[in-house]
């Protein structure tokens, strides 16, 4: 099975150019491929995982990935999928953002010894001379064809229109492909479905200038079963940078996956074998919740390392309760499977508050405690939450808004508060307190 077959089976592929030729090439020889990453933020987010994982699969199957960071094109701004012009950013900001992106990509891709490359297109774009570029590159582009591209057509039909600086973006991205093909023998560009027009333009430019056949592959737009974009929550984006989204919150994002998405997300966002993932489609109930835990653990392990994943899994056990993970469920995962081995200690990454026995001795009104720990914005909101049946202590519904949380509620030196279905906070009483 070639890497193209693997990507197809796991759900990465929406469209190819020259499909059979590409399949044959990938099956017969090592292929150098590239994907571009936008340096408009200091961190990539979950929405970038599909292209990152695709590069990782390429490398794991003997091919050489190139991660191109758009230090040059980022100064222009890609109009694809945008209804208005992006805010232009400074070269200094782009350079700082590239450093953060490189650190994150290194979690997924091995750059040691030339096994993969990270390049910055500012190295060749910022030194281009305008007139020679128009004569040597611009002459190969038809404006009539360019404005038929989806990314340009949408903007031309919008109220804001398309700026001249953005109109040049397709030429610059096509030039990237030409440069990487000539200098690095790169023959495959991959990207999101909104990049189809830019990718095809690059393929055409390489053919005209170098007389070489190169290829393109695009990914589908990945949404949840409810239609939401990947990586977006009520609290904002889910970042790959641990300083912006903690490993615990990252783990929680994945464990809250909808039932219908579990098998699909295991295919896309972990490296677990497909035969094991296919079995997940046949399970339900508690086993499906265990599969979500495996998804969360594996996704966190890949992005943040094994230690962070184990700690996030342990912290979740403290807040949500321990569970055994069946040995025959996704057996290739390294997730701790014995409930007795998880949740043994609280690291401080899970939401928690320390209290003394003295504070609990007389009891604290539940609505006051819910407000104090941040499970409600006000005491009035906390009262309403409890009155409507949404307040819990140790998974036991609070029947009255006059209920007082006390030492009698302690379970193994902890009290777990819950607001609604998914918001938890742990009260921890340390020994000797």
Swiss-Prot record:
Cellular localization per UniProt: Cytoplasm
UniProt domain S4 RNA-binding: residue ranges: 364-432
Record key words, sorted: Aminoacyl-tRNA synthetase, ATP-binding, Cytoplasm, Ligase, Nucleotide-binding, Protein biosynthesis, RNA-binding
Broad class of where this protein is predominantly found: cytoplasm
Reactions it catalyzes: tRNA(Tyr) + L-tyrosine + ATP = L-tyrosyl-tRNA(Tyr) + AMP + diphosphate + H(+)
Highest taxon above the source species: Bacteria
Sequence motif 'HIGH' region, residues: 39-48
Enzyme's top EC category: ligase
Annotated GO biological process: tyrosyl-tRNA aminoacylation
Motif segment ('KMSKS' region): 229-233
Residues that bind ATP: 232
One of the record's GO molecular function terms: tyrosine-tRNA ligase activity
Entries under InterPro entries matching the protein: aa-tRNA-synth_Ic, Rossmann-like_a/b/a_fold, S4_RNA-bd_sf, SYY-like_C, Tyr-tRNA-ligase, Tyr-tRNA-ligase_bac-type, Tyr-tRNA-ligase_bac_1
Record EC number: 6.1.1.1
Positions of L-tyrosine binding: 34, 169, 173
GO cellular component, one term: cytosol
Keyword rRNA-binding among record annotations: no
UniProt xrefs under HAMAP family: Tyr_tRNA_synth_type1
Described purpose of this protein according to its UniProt entry: Catalyzes the attachment of tyrosine to tRNA(Tyr) in a two-step reaction: tyrosine is first activated by ATP to form Tyr-AMP and then transferred to the acceptor end of tRNA(Tyr).
Oligomeric and partner information: Homodimer.
UniProt record similarity statement: Belongs to the class-I aminoacyl-tRNA synthetase family. TyrS type 1 subfamily.
Name the UniProt record assigns to this protein: Tyrosine--tRNA ligase
């Amino acid at each position: 099975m070639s890497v193209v077959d693997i990507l197809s089976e796991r759900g990465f592929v929406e469209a190819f150019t020259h499909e059979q030729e590409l399949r044959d090439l990938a099956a017969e020889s090592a292929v150098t491929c590239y994907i571009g990453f936008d340096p408009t933020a200091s961190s990539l987010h979950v929405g970038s995982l599909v292209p990152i994982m695709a590069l990782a699969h390429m490398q794991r199957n003997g091919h050489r990935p190139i991660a191109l960071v758009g230090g040059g094109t980022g100064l222009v701004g890609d109009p694809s999928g945008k209804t208005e012009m992006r805010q232009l950013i400074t070269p200094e900001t782009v350079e700082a953002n590239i450093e953060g992106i490189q650190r994150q990509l290194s979690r997924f891709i091995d750059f040691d010894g030339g096994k993969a490359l990270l390049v910055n297109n500012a190295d060749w774009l910022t030194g281009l001379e305008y007139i020679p570029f128009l004569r040597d590159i611009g002459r190969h582009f038809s404006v009539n064809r360019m404005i038929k591209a989806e990314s340009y057509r949408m903007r031309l039909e919008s109220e804001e229109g398309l700026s001249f600086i953005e109109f040049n973006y397709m030429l610059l991205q096509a030039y990237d492909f030409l440069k990487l093909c000539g200098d690095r023998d790169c023959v495959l560009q991959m990207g999101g479905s909104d990049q189809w027009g830019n990718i095809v333009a690059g393929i055409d430019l390489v053919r005209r200038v170098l007389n070489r056949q190169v290829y393109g592959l695009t990914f589908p737009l990945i949404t949840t079963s409810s239609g939401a974009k990947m990586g977006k929550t009520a609290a904002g984006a889910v970042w790959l940078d641990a300083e912006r989204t903690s490993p615990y919150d990252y783990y929680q994002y994945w464990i809250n996956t909808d039932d219908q998405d579990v098998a699909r997300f295991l295919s896309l966002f972990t490296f677990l074998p497909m035969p094991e993932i296919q079995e997940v489609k046949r399970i339900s109930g508690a086993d499906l919740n265990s599969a979500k835990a495996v998804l969360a653990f594996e996704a966190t392990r890949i992005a943040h390392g094994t230690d962070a994943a184990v700690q996030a899994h342990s912290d979740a056990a403290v807040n949500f309760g321990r569970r055994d993970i069946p040995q025959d469920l996704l057996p290739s995962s390294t997730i701790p499977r014995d409930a007795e081995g998880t949740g043994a200690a609280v690291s401080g990454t899970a939401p928690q508050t320390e209290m003394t026995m003295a504070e609990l001795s007389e009891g604290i009104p539940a609505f006051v405690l819910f407000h104090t720990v941040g499970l409600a914005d006000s005491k009035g909101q906390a009262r309403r939450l409890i009155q409507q049946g949404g307040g819990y202590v140790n998974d036991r519904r609070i029947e009255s808004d006059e209920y007082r949380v006390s030492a009698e509620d302690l379970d193994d030196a902890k009290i777990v508060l819950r607001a609604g279905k998914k918001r938890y906070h742990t009260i921890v009483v340390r020994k000797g307190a």
